[in-house]
Amino acid sequence: MKASRFFIGTLKEAPADAEIVSHKLMVRAGMIRRVAGGIYNYLPIGLRSIRKVEAIVREEMNRAGALELLMPAVQPAELWQESGRWEQYGPELLRFKDRKDNDFVIGPTHEEVITDIARNQIKSYRQMPVNFYQIQTKFRDEIRPRFGVMRGREFLMKDAYSFDKDAAGLNESYRKMYDAYVRIFTRLGLEFRAVAADSGSIGGNFSHEFHVIADTGEDAIAYCPTSEFAANIEAAEALPLIAERAAPAQAMEKVATPGKAKCEAVAELLAIPLERTIKSIVLATDNEGAEPTIWLVMLRGDHDLNEIKVSKLPGLKNHRFATEQEIVEWFGTPPGYLGPVGTKKPVKVIADRTVANMSDFVVGANEVDYHIAGVNWGRDLPEPDVADVRNVKKGDPSPDGKGVIDICRGIEVGHVFQLGTKYSEAMGATFLDESGKPQPMLMGCYGVGVTRILGAAIEQNFDDKGIIWPESIAPFELVLCPMGYDRSEMVREAADKLYAELTAAGVDVILDDRGERPGVMFADWELIGVPHRLVIGERGLKDGKVEYQGRRDAEATLLPADAAAATVTEKIRAALAH
């Protein structure tokens, strides 16, 4: 490719609405242009990187035995009504009517369509296992699209769906996809972690997320630096921090805490560690035709509630936070001074694992400006129901027993689920087993955010000059920068010779023949992030040299002009192999 025949749309300034590095640099590098909120044009230089991501994804999916197909972006509402997600999905599902007043959606995902294919095409256990995948445009009507391609409304995604006759087959399909994802993100040249995760709105019983590690990541990841453990903070098990409950050492005592409604303020006033205080959170579950059930969830003062964990407890799937009116009715006081001692009406108490082993702790007195100190289970309160209801914290023991937890930020770029029979039972996707009896198919679902990968890769690979692409997904692997291409025959001949040699060697190279000044030329390619650069100038050529610089290198080095193509080709191949 020659730059004079390519579109290079670099900008000196980022748009005002660009908040994070990847959004700013993708616009400035001429990769994307905004059409509407969360919807982008992908210009030629951006599309080149997308195609490289797609190629790696496609190769690894094919290697894992998945079969490519293509499903429509527009889906009939009937399929979503069958699965139950027409009502469940909410306003993110873009719905519309055609001219005949039929309801349709723009697909944010394709579980319904693929299940429809399976129930019509798969009749026998002999046709399984089978795994179908596509790379297709999706649309989710995000309430607040932001961060460029990181949280767009329209995006490109690879989604795969496996169908098996039994749990053993599903486990094997899941393992193959998990391994394929590890290969994909390794080949993409990204630092990533596979973490145990919650299945969210897709549903299912078992899932892992793949996160690119970046300080700007929206998700918190709990991991153990000395072991293989990693989990989304929503799913990470929080072990009890107190092994055994100590015997009471204090009498229960009501203490004045004027104006101190927060655990931190109470601890400071009473001159006790924050870890001695209890945070009381009131939840409610509605009962048709009757008053709600009120739940008091008790956490240590320095811990935070994990709503995902709470929603999985018996009776709390559809919980909500209690209203202030309900809190006053059940506890006799507004929020800030709540506790389990002497409630006005019965409540169900759930204590976090750590709280269940505490002694002589401080709770709200259910009276404004008062708390109760020296509270103990068994003596002052009945033994509670105990559950893991908190987020893990840095320094907590790792659930695998091999170290302590650390927390990092991650950008989710892939997700694998074991769906089980969630969709096949709802939509009647059955097969005849070995004995001729109908059984629901067991499904797996496996997604990769193709366009999101670009943003995540940039968040992990940039400097003050611009993007630093991994070789595998750079729009070009190498740029040739001739000094005076339009003026010097010596430079032009040397540049053209190098270009021909590199092209013949299979290097994805662009020759900058625009005749720009060196400063402009270098700034453009550093912004775009091409990982390797050769500079050809008359002075160097007279000594038989050209200048090489890797995008991450602080200094340039001189190479023999007649060996430069072979040397750089080897560097690129080594980087891709690594």
UniProtKB/Swiss-Prot annotation:
| Cystines in this chain | none
Q: Name one GO biological process term.
A: prolyl-tRNA aminoacylation
Q: Give an example GO cellular component term for this record.
A: cytosol
Q: Which InterPro entries match?
A: aa-tRNA-synt_IIb, aa-tRNA-synth_II, aa-tRNA-synth_II/BPL/LPL, Anticodon-bd, Anticodon-bd_dom_sf, Pro-tRNA-ligase_IIa, Pro-tRNA-synth_IIa_bac-type, Pro-tRNA-Synthase_IIa_type1
The family line of this record is: Belongs to the class-II aminoacyl-tRNA synthetase family. ProS type 1 subfamily.
Q: How does it assemble?
A: Homodimer.
- UniProt protein name: Proline--tRNA ligase
Please give the organism: Burkholderia vietnamiensis (strain G4 / LMG 22486) (Burkholderia cepacia (strain R1808))
